[in-house]
Amino acid sequence: MNFETVIGLEVHVELKTKSKIFSSSPNAFGAPPNTQTNVIDLGYPGVLPVLNRQAVEFAMKAAMALNCEIATETKFDRKNYFYPDNPKAYQISQYDQPLGKNGWIEIEVNGKKKKIGITRIHLEEDAGKLMHTGDGYSLVDFNRQGTPLIEIVSEPDIRSPEEAYAYLEKLKAIIQYTGVSDCKMEEGSLRCDANISLRPLGSDKFGTKTELKNLNSFNFVRMGLEYEAKRQEKILLSGGVIRQETRRFDEATKTTVLMRVKEGSEDYRYFPEPDLVMLYIDDEWKERVRASIPELPDARRKRYVEEWGLPEYDAKVLTLTKEMADFFEATVANGADPKLASNWLMVEVSGYLNSEQKELHDIALTPESLAGMIKLIQNGTISSKIAKKVFKELVEHGGDPEKIVKEKGLVQISDEGALRKIVLEVLDANPQSVEDYKNGKDRALGFLVGQVMKATKGQANPPLVNKLLVEEINKR
């Protein structure tokens, strides 16, 4: 029997407001434990929450960017559960009247585009963070308690781990472009839980789902879903039954491990938050927030193709993160050829960032210095090969590319007389390669070019070298 995988994702995104959602405590990552919390966050008797207007507007902005309908009336509810990181024994969330609903985003996998529905987006407060000491104790850091969150719940439209990965990439890009969150998974400002079930191929009835947690990277989401699909398939093929449960992805074994039997929404005993009034959002407020939404990834991608003639693939890669897209545009604004700028960012810059495990803002390279180096390639001062030496200096130490080229003696040799002399020496030293080229073996010319480049320490002008070699060979 063949099965179809059905996946839905729940993504929590921390909003980067200056203060928390219901209190004046600062909202910043990395402070010493329990230094960014107050009596409201900790649920002391008699204290009352006050809703952060900026958090509401950030949530609206994200929901609009994800094509959601924005509620005219919405409210907050208490989600009741006991856990050490939840000091009030309830979480202020939204239950039956979310801020946004019926949204969608478009993903692309293997060249095929597909819309993934978004059921709802709602606002809630984050919980504290448990820190396990390893000697039998657990400590609680309440700095995160009360941080404003949006939970983005997808429709069960995702049919493979690859689609889940593409959905998360696109969702992250859109949220980052709006500026409401930095979406750093390593800091917990973007977290994902996945629901997965299997059903017989062709059936429209959903199977029993399991929820996956501890998915700390997009790759772990993909690996966790791949493993869980195989685990469920094995159970079903052997005549077993899937239980509704919550499982944890184990990073060491790359498997999923049972955490608990899954609770239903009735277990949380939701009821309206008595300390917060209904929230009314009129059309004027909606339009003001909508007007603040910047150009989003798809629009930018289209503009790069139409305005600068970039291939679709290049435009897609460059717009995947706002930081890369901004860097690219600034490089072009400083006079670099768009296609050359695209190539350098996609190959050399991205390669360096991946190998060093860094972000663009961590390196010394600037759009101005990259543009300056590209202009040196364009005007023939340096070759692409020499440019890689300049790039290494710029990315590690920064500086003026023109000054680096002069100080290190990297100016490309374009003097025809000087190069012709070297070409003749190379031809005299390699008569067999000359003969091979004359006999139709084009590779021989590449070898001879390499010998000239070697003799000039890579500083010869490659097109001129090719021209001179062909001229001199034809004379022999």
From Swiss-Prot:
Into which EC class is this enzyme placed?
Answer: ligase
Sorted alphabetically, which InterPro entries does this protein's record hold? Asn/Gln-tRNA_amidoTrfase_suB/E (IPR017959), Asn/Gln-tRNA_Trfase_suB/E_cat (IPR006075), Asn/Gln_amidotransferase (IPR018027), Asn/Gln_tRNA_amidoTrase-B-like (IPR003789), GatB (IPR004413), GatB_C_1 (IPR042114), GatB_Yqey_C_2 (IPR023168), Gln-tRNA_amidoTrfase_suB_CS (IPR017958)
Any idea which UniProt keywords this protein has? Answer: ATP-binding, Ligase, Nucleotide-binding, Protein biosynthesis
Top-level division of the source organism's lineage:
Bacteria
> Reaction catalysed by this chain?
L-glutamyl-tRNA(Gln) + L-glutamine + ATP + H2O = L-glutaminyl-tRNA(Gln) + L-glutamate + ADP + phosphate + H(+); L-aspartyl-tRNA(Asn) + L-glutamine + ATP + H2O = L-asparaginyl-tRNA(Asn) + L-glutamate + ADP + phosphate + 2 H(+)
Per the record, the GO terms for biological process are: glutaminyl-tRNAGln biosynthesis via transamidation; translation
Q: Name one GO molecular function term.
A: glutaminyl-tRNA synthase (glutamine-hydrolyzing) activity
What EC number is given for this enzyme?
A: 6.3.5.-
Family of this protein: Belongs to the GatB/GatE family. GatB subfamily.
Q: How does it assemble?
A: Heterotrimer of A, B and C subunits.
PANTHER family with a match to the protein in the record: GLUTAMYL-TRNA GLN AMIDOTRANSFERASE SUBUNIT B MITOCHONDRIAL AND PROKARYOTIC PET112-RELATED, GLUTAMYL-TRNA(GLN) AMIDOTRANSFERASE SUBUNIT B, MITOCHONDRIAL
Q: What does the function comment of this entry state?
A: Allows the formation of correctly charged Asn-tRNA(Asn) or Gln-tRNA(Gln) through the transamidation of misacylated Asp-tRNA(Asn) or Glu-tRNA(Gln) in organisms which lack either or both of asparaginyl-tRNA or glutaminyl-tRNA synthetases. The reaction takes place in the presence of glutamine and ATP through an activated phospho-Asp-tRNA(Asn) or phospho-Glu-tRNA(Gln).
Listed name of the protein: Aspartyl/glutamyl-tRNA(Asn/Gln) amidotransferase subunit B
Q: Which organism is it from?
A: Geobacillus thermodenitrificans (strain NG80-2)
**Which gene holds the coding sequence for this protein?**
gatB
